[in-house]
């Protein structure tokens, strides 16, 4: 059992639940088109790339599009696999997740039929930020800094985007860590503090929290390997079949949320919404995770997130690469996802009706001096 990641076990538990309780696959009655509907949304305020859900929750653009009298309940998932499990157990109707948990969830059609229906974004440093302990040497580039990980203790959440990024980085640069550990973000944080960890890969906003609070230092992201990670929205297939009006309405509202977020003058408003939905994260940290510009030597770039909403060749290639990785590590039984599990028809139609194309926009990185609410205190590890 020790060789099996806890992330994989989490998914296995759902499969076992399905076997013991065949009723898990029963169809829910979502009502007839035009009738009020009640939706339960699984969302991740602790994953910056998925904050369009926070905008939906706080601003309620969905009220404009769903049938009058409809209601929405929100359930926080501390990681994507929790949201995916809730969807497989028919507890969430719509889920906002990172690439790996979305792909795994929709692949389990023997448990429940789910579909990927929209893209939250693609980025180099939303899901995979590379960190080293503060005492690590300062190097001239992210590539040199990550090579220091050879013979060191490195942690990722195995089976996640951080694992894929980690394994590809180690292959590319011939890095052989002394230990390649499976640790969630809480354990990584405590182990950096205790001096029991040399490097890790984690997602935003936890990455910025660790950097800005002086727990670890930022050394890079997936630009080193030329890869992008992504976030996606999944829906229950029964919802799609029974209530096309609700599916279209929710995705219309999702596009509104994306277009609001894409405007720099709204960045701080989005941060304030995220702040109301999280605990233990300052607004400065949340802003840095979403729009803060880190120096190049720390792996920073000019763009923090590419807002797609719909699907294109880049998104398809990212999904294909992620599925292939999950197959190699024996999480997926297939090397490629069946095409019908990704339903791009809804976003394609809405984008066409509005005269828009993907990608919609980019969240441009801003110098910390641009933070709207005063000076940000930069950590001692900050290097220009």
Language model feature labels by segment:
Residues 179-181, 186-284:
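Pocket-lining segment of extracytoplasmic ligand-binding domains
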Residues 243-336:
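Secondary-structure end/capping motifs
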Residues 63, 68, 171, 211, ...:
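Short polybasic/polar patches that bind polyanions
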């Amino acid at each position: 059992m020790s060789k099996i990641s806890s992330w994989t076990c989490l998914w296995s538990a759902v499969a076992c639940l399905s076997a013991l309780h065949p009723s898990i696959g029963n169809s829910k009655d979502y009502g007839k088109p035009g009738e009020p509907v009640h939706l339960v949304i699984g969302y991740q305020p602790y994953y910056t790339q998925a904050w369009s859900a926070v905008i939906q929750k706080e601003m309620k653009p969905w009220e404009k599009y769903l049938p009058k009298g409809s209601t929405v309940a929100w359930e926080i998932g501390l990681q994507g696999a929790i949201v995916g499990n809730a969807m497989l157990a028919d507890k969430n109707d719509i889920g906002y997740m990172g690439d790996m948990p979305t792909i795994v969830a929709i692949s389990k059609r023997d448990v429940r039929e789910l579909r990927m229906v929209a893209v939250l974004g693609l980025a180099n440093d939303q899901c995979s930020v590379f960190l080293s302990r503060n005492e690590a040497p300062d190097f001239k580039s992210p590539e040199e800094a990550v090579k220091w990980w050879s013979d060191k203790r490195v942690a990722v959440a195995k089976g996640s985007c951080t694992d894929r990024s980690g394994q590809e980085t180690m292959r590319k640069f011939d890095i052989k860590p002394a230990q390649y550990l499976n640790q969630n973000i809480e354990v990584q944080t405590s182990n950096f503090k205790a001096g029991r960890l040399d490097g890790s890969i984690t997602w935003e906003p936890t990455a910025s929290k660790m950097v800005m609070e002086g727990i670890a230092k930022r050394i890079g992201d997936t630009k080193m390997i030329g890869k992008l990670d992504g976030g996606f929205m999944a829906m229950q297939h029964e919802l799609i079949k029974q209530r096309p009006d609700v599916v279209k309405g929710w995705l219309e509202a999702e596009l509104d949320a994306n277009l609001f977020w894409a405007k720099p003058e709204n960045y701080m408003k989005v941060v304030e919404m995220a702040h109301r939905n999280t605990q233990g994260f300052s607004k400065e940290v949340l802003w840095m995770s979403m729009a803060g510009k880190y120096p190049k030597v720390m792996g920073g770039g000019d763009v923090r997130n590419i807002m797609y909403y719909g699907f294109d060749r880049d998104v398809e290639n990212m999904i294909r690469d992620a599925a292939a990785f999950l197959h190699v590590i024996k999480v997926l039984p297939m090397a490629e996802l069946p095409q019908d599990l990704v339903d791009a028809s809804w976003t394609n139609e809405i984008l066409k009706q509005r005269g828009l194309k993907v990608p919609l926009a980019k969240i441009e990185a801003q110098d910390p001096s641009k933070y709207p609410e005063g000076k940000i205190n930069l950590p001692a590890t900050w290097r220009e």
